[in-house]
A protein has these predicted regions:
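P-loop/Walker-type NTP enzyme "switch/lid" segment
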Residues: 5-15, 22, 26-80, 84-91, ...
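Beta-strand-loop-alpha "switch" segments that mediate conformational coupling across diverse proteins
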Residues: 137-179
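Inter-motif core of Ras-like GTPase G domains
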Residues: 89-108
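Hydrophobic anchor at the start of a short beta-strand
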Residues: 34-35, 78, 100, 128-131, ...
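Acidic-aromatic/histidine active-site loop/patch
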Residues: 1-5, 194-195
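Conserved beta-strand segments of the P-loop GTPase G domain that flank and frequently precede/overlap
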Residues: 38, 81, 101-105, 131-136
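NTP-binding/hydrolysis catalytic cores, primarily Walker-type P-loop NTPases
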Residues: 175-195
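Conserved C-terminal guanine-recognition region of P-loop GTPase G domains, centered on the G4
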Residues: 112-128
């Protein structure tokens, strides 16, 4: 069984790590993958939200403990939500991943911390081809344009910008399917991240 592990990390809080994990888990489940969502954040937002929506997606299983053999035999898509810090747990999650998604906002703190975030990822043993920046909720401000410019100049791997969506957040928080009531063009932007 082919497996793919995605870790979503940034040591800045509030950048959309959990939302991206929830989105990936639900889309993967809709595409027939057996999803293991791992919540390493002490706030447990990923686990709590998945408990609400697990009845809708039988291929998303909520467990509090797991042994390695069970995980290897029963899942083919791993999504790992992380806490905003730098520690050994984070290093292990980064090393485990086939892909590391790094949500980046169009703000000053994202810009000044970007190099430090990527250095930490690369120093944890993640290759440059594995780390993908996700432009999350970029607004049309001068600062956001500066962030975009830096991303382009540095030749980082960058996913298309995810739009701010109150509907996405509301659907996920209420345990509904992520795309409930969304127009097709809205859905397409989020599905592109998954593919």
């Amino acid at each position: 069984m082919n497996k793919l592990a995605v870790t979503v990390w940034n040591y800045k809080g509030g950048v959309g790590k959990t939302t991206i994990c929830l989105l990936l888990a639900q889309i993967a489940a809709q595409n027939g993958l057996k999803v293991l969502a791992v919540d390493l954040d002490e706030q447990k937002n990923l686990a709590e939200t998945l408990k609400l929506s697990s009845h809708m997606f039988p291929s998303i299983e909520v467990r509090t403990t797991l042994n390695d053999n069970y995980a290897d035999e029963n899942f083919n898509f791993y999504v790992i939500d992380t806490h905003p810090s730098k520690d050994e747990t984070i290093k292990r999650a980064l090393k485990f991943a086939d892909i590391v998604l790094v949500p980046v906002l169009g703000d000053y703190n994202s810009l000044i911390n970007l190099r430090s975030v990527l250095d930490y990822i690369y120093n944890s043993g993640v290759g440059t081809e594995q780390a993908v920046l996700v432009k999350n909720c970029m607004t049309k401000t001068k600062l956001a344009a500066e962030v975009e410019k830096v991303l382009d100049e540095q030749h980082y791997l960058v996913a298309d910008s995810l739009p701010r969506s109150n509907l996405l957040a509301k659907n996920i928080a209420s345990g509904n399917n992520w795309d409930k009531f969304m127009r097709a063009n809205q859905k397409a932007q989020f599905i592109k991240l998954y593919t």
